[in-house]
């Protein structure tokens, strides 16, 4: 592992001075390589799915693990989208001239070496790699045992693309073992080789990384996302948004887990809940909702802090916007919250009083995604307040330097 870290640092030094044209050529070569090796990639994924069935992996994890032609095409498209993004490296963030004539520029620079530790999503192999490459960073990937075959097949295509573009193959390295001790070594930083760790996976993985890492991390513990339906909301809009936010893909961190309804308008929005039930969604709710919809289960205290990642939704009535804010402040993981309302005064209160990384108005929580933000892809969602927050794209994978130009000035 130490040798891998040293190779990554050497590759990072080379990538830092690569031109935009060189990096974009490599991204196109990677896209072509993924297309050429698509059959092998899908076959490797099939083996992972067979193993998942034998290991009784839950539905949400299997959904994250699964690749098909459509998802693979989406991954390939994201590679080309990232290639089309502006190169962040070398961008002048701001500049000014001091009274003594010194001209100061704040310029974006790569972070260096990024370690990515992830579990069942094979797409992370590509998303993380291409974002690191575009931003001039080397990557060390450690995929989970569930996606082992898929991740290695995808990595093979990545290395082929790098080689054909003339870039160092050590720019994107993958740990070739399932040994969990490797994670501990990465969290220690590989003797200073790793600059940042990004975990992508379940609560246990992220909690371990947050507890044990000796290097900075970009992470979120869980996606406990909320939607508040205000009495001013449009019924059809509320129905469409909640159905999408819960059921489009239940196993992603942007799926809504709790819906809060203005108590004054509960009967108006009952069709939202019946529509969910018709789609097979289990609802766990407060007593006033159970009274009106007897086939709804009574929610327990644990339901308000539960990330289901399944077709299950907790629903609660609240005393207007103040009640919604109080609930979200108590239970939110700081990921994503949405308000459905036409009253802009209420919307303003929602946006001003909540501190989650992403706040939405009249839109599904499933838009909490770097691709949907125009970032091409994302390496993860960060809920911390230092450096990166929200979807982590190419700009968030850079630091900055101050470039100071003088004309012989000395300090008095």
Swiss-Prot record:
It is found in: Cytoplasm. One of its GO terms (biological process) is L-proline biosynthetic process. Pathway: Amino-acid biosynthesis; L-proline biosynthesis; L-glutamate 5-semialdehyde from L-glutamate: step 2/2. One of its GO terms (cellular component) is cytoplasm. Keywords: Amino-acid biosynthesis, Cytoplasm, NADP, Oxidoreductase, Proline biosynthesis. It catalyses: L-glutamate 5-semialdehyde + phosphate + NADP(+) = L-glutamyl 5-phosphate + NADPH + H(+). Its EC number is 1.2.1.41. Its main location: cytoplasm. InterPro entries: Ald_DH/histidinol_DH, Ald_DH_C, Ald_DH_N, Aldehyde_DH_dom, G-glutamylP_reductase_CS, Glu-5-SA_DH, GPR_dom. It is an enzyme of class 1 (oxidoreductase). It comes from the Bacteria. Catalyzes the NADPH-dependent reduction of L-glutamate 5-phosphate into L-glutamate 5-semialdehyde and phosphate. The product spontaneously undergoes cyclization to form 1-pyrroline-5-carboxylate. PANTHER family: DELTA-1-PYRROLINE-5-CARBOXYLATE SYNTHASE, GLUTAMATE SEMIALDEHYDE DEHYDROGENASE. Belongs to the gamma-glutamyl phosphate reductase family. This is Gamma-glutamyl phosphate reductase. The gene is proA.
